[in-house]
């Protein structure tokens, strides 16, 4: 089955999470006007009194054509990925309770100036880089096991 890859926008992604970007976002000045603060761009949610982690994940580029065959979700916390050097990357997401609902399966490509924050329980493909090795600032939950993995029928990513 082929899965069309769409440009990432907050409107298209809102059911799955937040788009972390400055484009079309409000800001205010701090530090004597030297800094524009784009405040509260994503909801970080951590359950069970665990702690928030800030990490760097170095992702390897995927082999093309890319075929998706599994999704994961994190029921106890949100998970954010922000590329550190302006790299484009692709995310694959789906809604669903116990298993991914394939009717909601979507793929999005970023513009190089966007990160994503997955809502709790949103099914998504594990992180991968697109064209080159990419470092991602990652904000997620530390503590007990927080990852469910489900196999899905193979989906090949298609670009317009």
UniProtKB/Swiss-Prot annotation:
<keyword id="KW-0659">Purine metabolism</keyword>
<comment type="pathway">
    <text>Nitrogen metabolism; (S)-allantoin degradation.</text>
</comment>
<dbReference type="InterPro" id="IPR011051">
    <property type="entry name" value="RmlC_Cupin_sf"/>
</dbReference>
<dbReference type="GO" id="GO:0050385">
    <property type="term" value="F:ureidoglycolate lyase activity"/>
</dbReference>
<comment type="subunit">
    <text>Homodimer.</text>
</comment>
<dbReference type="GO" id="GO:0000256">
    <property type="term" value="P:allantoin catabolic process"/>
</dbReference>
<dbReference type="InterPro" id="IPR047233">
    <property type="entry name" value="UAH_cupin"/>
</dbReference>
<comment type="function">
    <text>Catalyzes the catabolism of the allantoin degradation intermediate (S)-ureidoglycolate, generating urea and glyoxylate. Involved in the anaerobic utilization of allantoin as sole nitrogen source. Reinforces the induction of genes involved in the degradation of allantoin and glyoxylate by producing glyoxylate.</text>
</comment>
<dbReference type="InterPro" id="IPR007247">
    <property type="entry name" value="Ureidogly_lyase"/>
</dbReference>
<dbReference type="InterPro" id="IPR023525">
    <property type="entry name" value="Ureidogly_lyase_bac"/>
</dbReference>
<dbReference type="GO" id="GO:0006145">
    <property type="term" value="P:purine nucleobase catabolic process"/>
</dbReference>
<dbReference type="Pfam" id="PF04115">
    <property type="entry name" value="Ureidogly_lyase"/>
</dbReference>
<comment type="similarity">
    <text>Belongs to the ureidoglycolate lyase family.</text>
</comment>
<dbReference type="GO" id="GO:0004848">
    <property type="term" value="F:ureidoglycolate hydrolase activity"/>
</dbReference>
<dbReference type="InterPro" id="IPR024060">
    <property type="entry name" value="Ureidoglycolate_lyase_dom_sf"/>
</dbReference>
<protein>
    <recommendedName>
        <fullName>Ureidoglycolate lyase</fullName>
        <ecNumber>4.3.2.3</ecNumber>
    </recommendedName>
</protein>
<keyword id="KW-0456">Lyase</keyword>
